């Protein structure tokens, strides 16, 4: 190997500012034509540094083989004459091994590991980390077992294995590593403690995570940040904010990651006052303009209902990326400005702003899209044009968009063409079938999902129960509720029980629905009583209806639906005095019925309207058409259902009711 060529190759690929990291004599070789290059080799300091830079900057294809060749040419790296040279040589070999592992050359890394003239526990840790980094988990744990059996592990080994323990399935592994750390004494290492905290919280074992934290004699900012982040991930926002407050009173100063977690806690708990206080701290310490901090602030303000403050931050930012744009777009949609969110997205496209799949996925989640199939199809065209069709999250959004716009066929097409699906994909398609009344198709898809060993979630069962309710599959609905608890260990929520009540109510089994409510393991809320009352209203059951209404009045005294539904029951039974009392009580309490809004898309434009709407610019023409349609409907056999009319005018010619 020509050493002059090696040095020239190296320095030609290094920026001028980095070329000085090599010893001056190595750089001068290029200017010394009389130098005998066969006698020149890189020392361990230069070699280790270059190997590190090569891996960090992604220069492996150009420089990796050259550096490896230079190491092979140096006899000191094979047969060190003393302990110091042996130690230095081992550093070089481990640096080379790390380079191969980090660059995804796992096969070469294993081959190098087997052929290395010297190894230590760091060498094994590098290969172990390489296995995990390249998703060779099984091979990695085989090596770990061998390391543990021979006692050839250290605290870094434990932190490496804990780095992959980030789902509930790894909870037992985390506990085993914790026990091993205690037995080996490495539990006193702060890095091991920090990793244990992170793993426990990510596995959902928040109590164990707090236990590790409470037992640590030494803590640093990473420790406290790990606990705060873990609490937020487990939706313990109030606890996270309390710990953040205690942290600020102590001697540990928060870092940017800590502030991000604290802002996430404010977002999750909608604590805008605390969020504003954190904003002031960020301004005080001069880190409020960091891009990730700005995005977190926008998210906090928008989720706390202050979209104006979020927009102010967005307009003042010096740099915009896909994350900040997605945050402000979702913020607009969540605060009732769906149309503005779409217009914002269109302006982004017109301005030539580079968008990614996450932005498109966020746009597809805007409810305004659900009223405009034309706009949804345009977004689908954009997805194809930008080559986002392989993105699972985008496809999930397309499935939901098409089904909510009434196009079940295109929802199925997107689902079947997906190159990769996750549990959300299956849930979205099952929900689409349920939404369109295709209960049997939803159940069949669920069977396919379980056959492929895709684990269902509580959302899966919610959609399935909706499907059973709409097609009257009572026994199947009960079976699914039991399967949810007994087989999959998923605790039903109020929404699941409401589906069962709705299912029984649709079938006219009102007393059975009442008995089911009485047997619930949780206190019924207004959704449950409203479902029963709605069924009683449909079937005209005064006895159960009055009971459900009374319970609903106690749970939600300001609810207009309770008054309207019980009044409907009285109307259907001809109990006009009782109906009048209900309406009188409703007026005395100042309770008003919330106005429902409908919409329709005509020629790519969405029109929204309410009952007896007179504000539309074409209102007069619309009512003329409606007046002409009613006699045609009567001729076709339509008769108005007078059971639920609160006050019938008696004019059947135009169907006027109030």
UniProtKB/Swiss-Prot annotation:
Residues 528-603 are annotated as: Type E motif. GO terms for biological process: RNA modification. PROSITE patterns: PPR. GO terms for molecular function: RNA binding. Signal peptide: none annotated. It holds the Pfam family PPR. Belongs to the PPR family. PCMP-E subfamily. Residues 604-634 are annotated as: Type E(+) motif. Gene3D superfamilies: Tetratricopeptide repeat domain. Coiled coil: none annotated. NCBIfam families: PPR. Keywords: Repeat. The lineage of its organism: Eukaryota, Viridiplantae, Streptophyta, Embryophyta, Tracheophyta. PPR repeats lie at residues 189-219, 220-254, 255-289, 290-320, 321-355, 356-390, 391-421, 422-456, 457-492, 493-523. This is Pentatricopeptide repeat-containing protein At3g05340. InterPro entries: E_motif, Pentatricopeptide_rpt, PPR_At4g14850-like_plant, TPR-like_helical_dom_sf.
